[in-house]
From Swiss-Prot:
Localization per Swiss-Prot or TrEMBL: Cytoplasm; Cytoplasm, Cytoskeleton
UniProt feature, compositional bias: Polar residues: 1-17
Protein name: Microtubule-associated protein RP/EB family member 2
Domain notes: The N-terminal domain may form a hydrophobic cleft involved in microtubule binding and the C-terminal may be involved in the formation of mutually exclusive complexes with APC and DCTN1.
SUPFAM superfamilies referenced in this protein's UniProt entry, alphabetically: Calponin-homology domain, CH-domain, EB1 dimerisation domain-like
Major place of residence: cytoplasm
InterPro entries: CH_dom (IPR001715), CH_dom_sf (IPR036872), EB1_C (IPR004953), EB1_C_sf (IPR036133), MAPRE (IPR027328)
Domain EB1 C-terminal: 234-304
Species in which this protein is naturally found: Xenopus laevis
Function: May be involved in microtubule polymerization, and spindle function by stabilizing microtubules and anchoring them at centrosomes.
Length: 327
């Protein structure tokens, strides 16, 4: 039974215990040997400031930062409403505090988003993070709600990241992290400003800031960086892809103009033939009448005529065969 200062989660384990994917529970211990360091956490540094400062990143910079750190391909802040990115951030900050196998990285429905945020909230509780997640607002995918939360989480990340290396793709164990569906902005509307992994805004995520007044603990800074993501396309690659697509569109437009000119040319020829037939149509010439019939016939009439001619040829062939048999 737990001591008087311990509390149990609904599943029976201590709130700070590590839960393995197979259900095994490793009790939390503040003082462990070096080999168990990945499962030994102190209390997370809580961040309460939500005001806009000079360190606050724009929507484009914040998405570039998310993609760079955890190897995703998000293009809008609203796509963070799935909660999957936050779950991986927590695994990066506090390895083992959340089971990534339970995270739905390909979530497309609201109840799947809620599932991910429940896992995130459980990891917050396990790490004594005081932040209350506004799940009902975030899963609706509204821009401002998701922007406010990711701005807070960026500050929380900077206050707790110790600079250790982390491979997000390996941590996901092969799970495809597809961005949630979004009918809005397309890939052609991406910002042209490049966001490199070694930029000042992205680099800020790899070192802990100076301790703010009122903070009781801090983590040491480190020069180590997260493992770079080969799967995330840079803005330069996307601009090159857009340029190639624009060239294809231009080539198709030129081909279409050529086809339209050819169409107009032959239409003019047919119009001249039509006028000539109309001028001499009163003479009762059978040839002119047949030309007029061809000019004014529809597709259905042509197909019916071809079918009729085919039947006549078939009947004629049967008659010839019968005559040969008689001989």
């Amino acid at each position: 039974m737990p001591g008087p200062t311990q509390t149990l989660s609904p599943n029976g384990e201590n709130n700070n215990d590590v839960i393995h994917d197979n259900g095994t529970i490793i009790p939390f211990r503040k003082h462990t040997v070096r080999g168990e360091r990945s499962y030994s956490w102190g209390m997370a540094v809580n961040v309460y400031s939500t005001s806009i400062t000079q360190e606050t990143m724009s929507r484009h910079d914040i998405i570039a930062w998310v993609n760079d750190i955890v190897c995703l391909n998000y293009i809008k802040v609203e796509q963070l409403s799935s909660g999957a990115a936050y779950c991986q951030f927590m695994d990066m900050l506090f390895p083992g505090c959340i089971s990534l196998k339970k995270v739905k990285f390909q979530a497309k429905l609201e109840h799947e988003y809620i599932h991910n945020f429940k896992l995130l909230q459980a990891s917050f509780k396990r790490m004594n993070v005081d932040k209350v997640i506004p799940v009902e607002k975030l899963v609706k995918g509204r821009f401002q709600d998701n922007l406010d939360f990711i701005q807070w989480f960026k500050k929380f990340f900077d206050a707790n990241y110790d600079g250790k290396e982390y491979d997000p793709m390996e941590a996901r164990q092969g799970q495809d992290a597809l961005p949630p569906p979004d009918p809005g902005e397309q890939i052609f509307n991406l910002p042209k400003k490049p966001h490199h992994a070694n930029s000042p805004t992205a680099g800020a995520a790899r070192s802990s800031p100076i301790a703010k007044p009122g903070s009781t603990s801090s983590r040491p800074s480190s020069a180590k960086k997260a493992v770079p993501c080969p799967s995330v396309k840079s803005d330069k690659d996307l601009e090159t892809q857009v340029s190639h697509l624009n060239e294809q569109v231009h080539s198709l437009k030129i081909a279409l103009e050529g086809v339209e000119k050819e169409r107009d040319f032959y239409f003019g020829k047919l119009r001249e033939i039509e006028l000539l037939c109309q001028e001499h149509g009163q003479e009762g010439d059978d040839l002119l009448q047949r030309l007029m019939d061809i000019l004014y016939s529809s597709e259905e009439q042509e197909s019916h005529t071809e079918q009729h001619e085919g039947e006549e040829e078939q009947e004629h062939g049967h008659e010839e065969a019968e005559q040969q048999e008689e001989y």
